[in-house]
């Protein structure tokens, strides 16, 4: 699964259908980040089964 955050931000996103999913000027990684925080919208989508993930 891919995780993205905007450059200069500490909030990581992991649902491609998140309204704040970064599409430019971002950092991407393949594993769960060990610093920063996970986006609340992404976590809500994950919990209710509507999170679209990028492999």
Where are each of the predicted segments found?
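Extended terminal accessory/targeting regions
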Residues: 5, 30-31, 51-52
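K/E-rich alpha-helical interaction surfaces of small helical-bundle regulatory domains
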Residues: 7-20
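Cys/His-coordinated zinc-binding microdomains
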Residues: 19-22, 43
